[in-house]
């Protein structure tokens, strides 16, 4: 859009009001507008209020009106005629001419205009509105000299004037349109033939340069020409300000051009310096009066680029002198706006002063004047604008932090420097200030190198190279996957801030990225359009560009919110759940059951989401044994992703290496199970680039390179790396070879073929490797090169080696004992793992897993030959598939098996032992030791694989899984000794599997039948007589079992299905009813007594009378009948019009109750007379039962209700709520509650008066029935969803009994309530142990349990609660005392170290002292607010309390106050004694920790945290203090409070930090959901991932080998020192507030906001094996399907 400008500023208000009037109808009519006419600059109201074209002109300009009429045919937009500004012509005459002219030239085409005239004539033209067709055109209006100068001057004022009269966004928008306006102005200037040396010419040249500067390299060169033309004129005219600005601008552009030249004496550098000196001379003449923001920025960038630090220092000092002359004005005038007398607002002036100080600081730092630099930096921070959140000042603040980091680094404050630099990194983005961002990376790299954090240093190196690539500084980025095409890069220099170059939006415009891959987004779309929607599996060799392809081809095609990228690691399921939970309301993983997880996923809306599981950056899920909870979550997510999610708009893309294809298929198959079919897998292989593709890539890369290669060098470079194709396949290159060789050539500035030919290919590649690893110290560099050469030392070009083979090659182990594997030093193992990680991340090597054993090899054949010293090009087609060795999908390419490798080692040993050399004998012994270690490793790997299958198996076959886990545990036991710590086990998987299974298993026995089992009854409890279990099947057979699962008898008397069972009250008889129309009576052990014949159809029920004299039966012949034990029918009850489903006696045996399909229940006497009719149900009555006292009746019906009746057949309550049939209704044993079960998938608990007390939700399908336990406290439900579920009577789910493969027909409790028995259509009856097993729950508190502690002996427990009490417990869970005297909630309590006393602290402002029997001894009064923390001294003689009143107080053990530690004005969160009891450390809300003598004298203050300190602790030797803070860090201090180390890494509040027992490690926990392990140097040893909520507390095991964390995700978790999760302690229903080990390390005690505390066992492998064997004893002894080898007494193999 061309905009003509005018000096008619009086039109501004009119035009603004005009916008308001035109805007609304214009938007509705969708018209097109263009602004032209009397050429005035108007603020951009037309672009926001109107979307189109408008023509505005002054009716007083007659010449202009004539031109408009001549050009009218070219204009098709709105016409706005403005009158009243000058003379007023006759508007009607003009409009008539306008209309006639348009009609003559355009025929019948429509047109439209809006006329604004005086109100007197407005009505006359209101109706003249029609629409125009066609395209709008520009009006070609010729200007005079006066108009041209005025137009140029207005542009000049808007662009040049500082401060600008325009808002920043308006000014930026005007700069974008500047080239279009200038083109027309310059065109008019040429027509008028003005003088070349004039003010107009100077302004136009400057504006033209500014307009072209943002157009890349060519645009900058054009800008240089325009600026020089303008500078020549300004120098003649003598305008100092323009001379300064143009000199700096030219110097800056030459600096950009010169930056690629290494030589500082290059002509471009000299021109840069000349222009800078010109500007400085002009500034000095003007006493720096023209130093404003842009001038100072330009000068600083130029002098920085020239590295002229002395001149930069002088410039900064001169600027400060000038700024401080203005500062009193700025300080007293707080007006935010500018005016003509005021150059800057206060905020802008602060920014300029701070900027000048920062330049001064940088100059001083570069001159190694650190003390002066530190002072300048201090001033820069003091004067910086306080509104740091404003975008304009964030780069300035980032620069200050960068300089502060450099000063700290120079003063050897490495960790402080690291934190400061990280903060600087968060304040600036790479796109906004590339130079500063890269400078920060350089200093960060130096920090990591000094901290010897080589992995972090490598990551910074790689990021730096990638950033330089984006800037066009390099064409190659080291041994990494191929980048996208070069046009994706940001093609500007790091010294070019976006504000200075202008056109930032254009510079950052997203360009479609391209890779050397032919697969496109359209190809993916076609794949996903198939039915059923397939899963896309992306695979290819490491380094071919899968990640680049994902970023370039996939992520750019979809908005970021529609793409979810998750690392495909063992924790992928938890991470995916968290990602989904951030956008949708998903239940917490710590509390939700599996059905709730499934329901939540199925309830998700249409997502339109692409889920990418990227398996390139770590171990894959099946390569590590997850916990059972992770297994369940993964199975839920897989079933959702593969079955349901496609219909919800979710598309799945999985990226894995070729070797993982077969394992991926097995994983998906195993997760879906037999009931679901696996959707099609669409494989897409990204092949290495062909020679032609690489040529295209290199050509484009060189086109933007500062030192491009000639075609001859490009051809030779690609030719040396090319590999011959197979058959018709084209020659190809490995991308890592290309990047590795290209990087070293670029670094060595090789630009000629002759220079390249000076070395062979293998020499170049070896140099490239050495250069890449040059950041390592000499000892590590040497080992890294030895490792690479070891991998190259094999018969094959790409040989595979295990970690232990590399250990044996690089390190020596002490001589092992006989038959024992060698034990390499832990330091050597850690060093090798570090080197492997470094080389893997650098893509110099790759890892291939075979049977979960990792094998390492070099990434490319060229690299292997270079390290071997061979330069021959290998042209074998087998290399294309080198990475697929060991893939089950390609059996022809199998790596040597462990057995083959073992045989090779044995041959080598034998050969060496045959020699006579002592040296050879030593080598042979070492190899033999390595072989033993290798065998042990392989055994551990095999155990890992077995346990992965076992944990999956447990979800379906619990007993078989436990048996298999016991066997793997026995195998592991053979590899270790009783003294071997867990961290040295070759595999922890068997220990983890046993712990996990034994903590969750319920099934303890299984009885197999010959058909579906439909009915179950347990004999009544009898003294000295064990109960028996009676089951029956659909094929007419009944089975009699002992309570331990031993088959006693098989009863084959019925000819058809058995429908009902019952025991007599004395347990001596039982009865079976059948579809064969008969009932049979049997003695206890299965002798048949009588057959009851008389029914004419199926018999549906049978019940004994209470005094076991009679039986009552009911059947489908519409009758009920009473029989004696001789089988004689005594009474016939007739009256029902349909089946009688049930009949039973009341508790006295005098009344009979029947329920029928005719919709009624009836009461009968023993003579068969009907004495009551219960009518009211609208469908058939499925069951009817007397209450235990015989006074009430409950019935349930297919009409969805249950009803309560009295003995007079009056209904007094209708139980409504179910949405389908009510299948069963039963009374609780005490008659106070009723349980109903329904086909709607729920059961409900009701009071005896009909009030619903709770709904039991969770089953997926119809619930057949439900039963109360004998004590009435538990309920079991059984369902067609193949499960039974255990609940409290209040409706809380306790556990799900999984294992049945088909629907569960019946279930019942044992008399003691410890067991549940179930029967199923899967032909089994199962026994489930529902006791709490090893976990002990401490129940009694009525509110949160805030903390729980062991006494020193570990035989007593203390809990404190928000219910204002503390409680003492035994380790069996018995409460022995309630400490109830506080008036507020008890926050903390502790046993004294001698075990004689207890102290509690409360919100009631007191602490109280008790003896260990719970008797209160004294009250510690003195605090003025809540007591937050209490601690005994190590000798039990003193107590320290910490309070919200800002004090800590010291007391003796009689309650006398000894000292007040009064230093703070805010909360003291914690207070701890030193190990010798002589000192105390306190943690406070004022960001400090205090160190005190016990008598109250201050020793030191730990200052440095930037937030409240929540925790403080002495080290075991009392020499150091450890603190944890809200500022996301923990810190270590010396005894006087001087800072030593900062543990920075957490992303949120650090709640607690603890030294390990030996003091060599530190554990921290944080609100960022993680815990971390650190060594004493501050290096992160491990990050503990797994919790789904904040982690609040941590505790070390007494031996320091494990730690336990507690989280608000409802779990506590155990970890080893490598960060591996050992156990998840699940069971609490709310936040776990604390967790600690017992003194012997065998138990963990947790407290929770659910009002309970729990004791969890931590068992050794022998204990677990013993427990597992005991659990399986009955199953292995009596189950007929168990192998004889697994029977007790047989050797388990």
UniProtKB/Swiss-Prot annotation:
Pfam families, per the entry: WD40
Keywords of the record: Repeat, WD repeat
The WD repeat ranges on this chain: 1008-1042, 1053-1083, 1094-1124, 1135-1165, 1176-1206, 1217-1247, 1258-1288, 1299-1329, 1340-1370, 1381-1411, 1422-1452, 1463-1493, 1504-1534, 1545-1575, 1586-1616, 1627-1657
Database matches in CDD domains: WD40
Record InterPro entries: G-protein_beta_WD-40_rep, TPR-like_helical_dom_sf, WD40/YVTN_repeat-like_dom_sf, WD40_repeat_CS, WD40_repeat_dom_sf, WD40_rpt
SUPFAM superfamilies: DPP6 N-terminal domain-like, TPR-like, WD40 repeat-like
PANTHER family in alphabetical order: TRANSCRIPTION INITIATION FACTOR TFIID, TRANSCRIPTION INITIATION FACTOR TFIID SUBUNIT 5
UniProt-recorded name of the protein: Uncharacterized WD repeat-containing protein sll0163
Organism whose genome encodes this protein: Synechocystis sp. (strain ATCC 27184 / PCC 6803 / Kazusa)
């Amino acid at each position: 859009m061309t905009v003509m400008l005018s000096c008619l500023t009086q039109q501004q208000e009119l035009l603004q009001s005009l916008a308001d009037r035109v805007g609304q109808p214009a938007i509705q009519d969708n018209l097109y507008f263009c602004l032209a006419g009397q050429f005035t600059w108007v603020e951009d109201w037309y672009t926001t209020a109107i979307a189109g074209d408008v023509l505005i002109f002054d009716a007083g300009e007659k010449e202009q009106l004539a031109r408009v009429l001549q050009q009218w045919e070219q204009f098709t937009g709105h016409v706005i005629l403005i009158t009243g500004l000058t003379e007023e012509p006759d508007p009607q005459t003009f409009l008539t001419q306008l209309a006639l002219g348009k009609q003559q030239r355009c025929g019948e085409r429509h047109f439209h205009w809006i006329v604004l005239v005086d109100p007197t004539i407005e009505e006359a033209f209101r109706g003249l509105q029609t629409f125009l067709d066609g395209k709008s055109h520009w009006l070609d209006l010729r200007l005079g000299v006066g108009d041209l100068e005025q137009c140029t001057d207005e542009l000049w004022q808007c662009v040049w004037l500082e401060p600008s009269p325009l808002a920043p966004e308006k000014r930026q928008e005007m700069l974008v349109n500047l080239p279009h306006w200038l083109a027309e102005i310059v065109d008019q200037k040429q027509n008028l033939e003005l003088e070349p040396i004039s003010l107009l010419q100077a302004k136009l040249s400057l504006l033209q340069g500014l307009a072209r500067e943002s157009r890349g390299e060519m645009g900058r060169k054009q800008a240089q020409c325009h600026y020089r033309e303008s500078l020549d004129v300004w120098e003649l005219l003598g305008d100092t300000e323009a001379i300064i600005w143009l000199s700096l601008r030219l110097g800056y552009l030459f600096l950009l051009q010169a930056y690629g030249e290494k030589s500082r004496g290059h002509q471009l550098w000299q021109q840069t310096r000349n222009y800078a000196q010109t500007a400085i001379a002009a500034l000095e003449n003007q006493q720096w009066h023209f130093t404003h923001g842009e001038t100072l920025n330009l000068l600083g960038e130029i002098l920085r680029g020239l590295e002229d630090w002395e001149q930069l220092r002088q410039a900064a000092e001169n600027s400060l002198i000038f700024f401080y002359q203005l500062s009193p004005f700025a300080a007293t005038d707080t007006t935010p706006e500018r005016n003509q007398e005021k150059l800057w607002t206060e905020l802008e002036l602060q920014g300029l002063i701070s900027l000048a100080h920062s330049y001064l600081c940088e100059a001083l730092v570069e001159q190694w004047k650190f003390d002066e630099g530190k002072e300048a930096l201090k001033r820069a921070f003091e004067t910086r604008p306080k509104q740091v959140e404003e975008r304009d000042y964030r780069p300035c603040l980032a620069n200050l932090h960068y300089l502060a980091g450099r000063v700290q680094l120079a003063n050897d404050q490495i960790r402080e420097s690291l934190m400061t630099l990280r903060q600087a990194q968060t304040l600036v983005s790479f796109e906004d200030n590339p130079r500063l961002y890269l400078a920060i990376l350089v200093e960060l790299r130096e920090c990591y190198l000094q901290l010897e954090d080589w992995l972090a240093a490598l990551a910074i190196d790689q990021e730096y190279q990638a950033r330089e690539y984006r800037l066009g500084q390099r064409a190659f980025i080291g041994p990494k996957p191929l980048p996208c095409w070069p046009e994706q890069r940001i093609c500007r220099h790091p010294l070019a801030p976006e504000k200075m170059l202008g056109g930032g939006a254009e510079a950052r415009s997203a360009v479609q990225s391209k890779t050397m891959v032919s697969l496109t987004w359209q190809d993916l779309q076609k794949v996903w359009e198939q039915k059923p929607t397939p899963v896309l599996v992306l695979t290819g060799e490491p380094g071919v560009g899968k990640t680049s392809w994902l970023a370039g081809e996939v992520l750019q095609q979809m908005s970021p919110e529609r793409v979810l990228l998750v690392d495909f690691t063992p924790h992928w399921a938890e991470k995916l759940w968290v990602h989904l939970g951030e956008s949708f309301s998903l239940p917490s993983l710590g509390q939700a059951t599996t059905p709730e997880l499934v329901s939540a996923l199925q309830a998700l809306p249409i997502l339109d989401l692409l889920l990418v599981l990227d398996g390139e950056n770590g171990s894959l899920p099946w390569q590590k044994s997850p916990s059972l909870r992770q297994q369940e979550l993964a199975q839920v997510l897989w079933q959702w992703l593969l079955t349901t999610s496609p219909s919800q708009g979710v598309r799945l893309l999985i990226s894995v290496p070729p070797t993982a294809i077969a394992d991926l298929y097995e994983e998906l198959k195993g997760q879906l199970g037999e009931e679901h079919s696996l959707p099609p897998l669409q494989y897409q292989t990204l092949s290495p680039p062909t020679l032609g593709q690489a040529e295209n890539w290199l050509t484009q890369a060189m086109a933007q390179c500062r030192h491009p290669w000639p075609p001859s060098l490009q051809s030779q470079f690609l030719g040396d790396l090319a590999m011959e194709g197979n058959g018709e396949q084209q020659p190809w290159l490995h991308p890592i070879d290309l990047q590795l060789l290209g990087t070293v050539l670029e670094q060595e500035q090789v630009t000629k073929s002759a220079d390249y030919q000076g070395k062979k290919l293998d020499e170049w590649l070896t140099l490239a490797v050495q250069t890449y690893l040059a950041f390592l110290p000499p000892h590590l560099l040497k080992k890294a090169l030895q490792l690479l050469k070891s991998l190259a030392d094999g018969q094959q070009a790409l040989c595979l080696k295990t970690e232990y083979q590399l250990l044996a090659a690089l390190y020596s182990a002490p001589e092992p004992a006989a038959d024992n594997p060698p034990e390499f030093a832990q330091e050597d193992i850690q060093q090798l793992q570090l080197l492997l990680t470094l080389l893997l991340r650098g893509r110099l090597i790759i890892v291939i897993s075979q049977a979960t054993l990792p094998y390492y090899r070099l990434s490319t054949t060229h690299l292997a030959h270079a390290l071997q010293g061979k330069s021959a090009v290998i042209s074998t087609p087998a290399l294309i598939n080198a990475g697929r060795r060991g893939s089950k999908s390609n059996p022809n390419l199998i790596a040597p098996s462990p057995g083959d490798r073992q045989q090779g080692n044995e041959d080598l040993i034998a050969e060496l032992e045959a020699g006579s050399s002592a040296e050879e004998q030593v080598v042979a012994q070492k190899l033999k030791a390595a072989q033993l270690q290798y065998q042990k490793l392989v055994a551990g790997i095999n155990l890992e694989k077995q346990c992965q299958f076992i944990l999956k198996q447990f979800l379906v076959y619990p007993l078989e899984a436990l048996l298999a886990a016991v066997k793997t545990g026995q195998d592991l036991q053979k590899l270790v000794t009783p003294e071997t710590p867990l961290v040295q086990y070759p595999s922890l998987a068997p220990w983890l599997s046993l712990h996990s299974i034994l903590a969750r298993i319920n099934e303890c026995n299984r009885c197999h039948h010959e058909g579906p089992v439909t009915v179950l009854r347990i004999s009544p409890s009898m003294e000295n007589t064990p109960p028996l279990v009676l089951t029956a099947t659909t094929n007419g057979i009944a089975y009699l079992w002992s309570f331990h699962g031993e088959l006693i008898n098989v009863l084959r008397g019925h000819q058809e299905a058995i429908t009902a069972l019952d025991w007599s009250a004395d347990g001596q008889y039982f009865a079976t009813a059948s579809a064969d129309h008969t009932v049979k009576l049997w003695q206890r052990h299965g002798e048949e007594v009588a057959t009851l014949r008389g029914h004419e159809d199926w018999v549906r029920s049978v019940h004994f009378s209470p005094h076991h004299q009679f039986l009552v039966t009911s059947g489908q012949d519409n009758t009920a009948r009473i029989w004696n034990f001789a089988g004689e029918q005594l009474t016939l009850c007739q009256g029902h019009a349909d089946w009688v489903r049930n009949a039973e006696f009341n508790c006295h045996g005098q009344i009979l109750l029947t329920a029928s399909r005719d919709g009624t229940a009836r009461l009968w006497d023993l003579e068969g007379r009907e004495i009551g009719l219960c009518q009211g149900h609208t469908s058939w009555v499925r069951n009817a039962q007397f209450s235990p006292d015989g006074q009430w009746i409950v019935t349930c019906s297919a009409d969805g209700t249950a009803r309560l009746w009295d003995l007079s057949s009056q209904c007094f309550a209708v139980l409504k709520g179910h949405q389908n049939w009510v299948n069963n209704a039963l009374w609780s044993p005490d008659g106070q509650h009723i349980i109903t079960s329904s086909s709607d998938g729920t059961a409900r608990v009701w009071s005896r008066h009909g009030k619903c007390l709770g709904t039991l939700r969770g089953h997926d399908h119809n619930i057949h029935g439900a039963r109360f336990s004998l004590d009435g406290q538990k309920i079991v439900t059984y369902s067609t969803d193949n499960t039974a579920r255990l609940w409290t009577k209040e409706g809380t789910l306790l556990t799900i009994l999984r294992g049945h493969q088909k629907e569960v027909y019946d279930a019942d409790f044992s008399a003691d309530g410890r067991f549940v028995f179930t029967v199923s259509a899967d032909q089994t009856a199962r026994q489930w142990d529902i006791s709490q097993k090893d976990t002990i729950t401490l129940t009694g508190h009525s509110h949160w349990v805030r903390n729980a502690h062991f006494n020193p002996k570990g035989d007593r427990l203390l809990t404190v609660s928000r219910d204002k009490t503390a409680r003492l417990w035994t380790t069996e869970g018995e409460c022995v005392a309630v400490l109830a005297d506080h008036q507020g909630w008890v926050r903390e309590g502790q046993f004294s170290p001698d075990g004689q006393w207890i102290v509690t602290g409360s919100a009631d402002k007191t602490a109280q002292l008790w003896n260990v029997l719970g008797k209160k001894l004294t009250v510690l009064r003195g605090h003025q607010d809540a007591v937050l923390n209490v601690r005994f001294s190590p000798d039990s003689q003193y107590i320290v309390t910490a309070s919200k009143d800002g004090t800590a107080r010291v007391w003796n053990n009689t309650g006398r106050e000894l000292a007040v530690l009064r230093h703070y004005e805010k909360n003291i969160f914690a207070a701890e004694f030193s190990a010798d009891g002589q000192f105390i450390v306190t943690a406070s809300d004022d960001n400090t920790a205090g160190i005190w003598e016990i008598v109250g004298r201050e020793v030191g203050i730990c200052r440095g945290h930037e937030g409240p300190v929540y925790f403080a602790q002495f080290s075991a030797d009392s020499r150091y203090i450890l603190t944890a803070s809200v500022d996301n860090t923990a810190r270590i201090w010396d005894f006087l409070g001087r800072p030593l180390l900062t543990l920075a890494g957490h992303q949120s509040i650090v709640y607690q930090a603890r030294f390990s027992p030996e003091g060599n490690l530190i554990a921290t926990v944080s609100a960022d959901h993680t815990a971390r392990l650190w060594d004493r140097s501050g290096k992160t040893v491990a990050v503990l991932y797994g919790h789904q909520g904040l982690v609040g507390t941590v505790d070390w095991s007494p031996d320091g080998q494990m730690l336990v964390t507690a989280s608000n995700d409802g779990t506590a978790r155990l970890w080893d020192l490598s960060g591996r999760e050992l156990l998840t302690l699940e069971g609490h229903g709310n936040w776990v507030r604390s967790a600690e080990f017992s003194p012997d390390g065998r138990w963990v005690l947790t407290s929770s906001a659910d009002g309970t505390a729990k004791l969890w066992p931590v068992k050794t492998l022998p204990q677990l094996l013993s427990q597992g064997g005991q659990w399986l004893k009955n199953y292995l002894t009596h189950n007929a399907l168990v192998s004889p080898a697994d029977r007790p007494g047989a050797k388990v193999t």
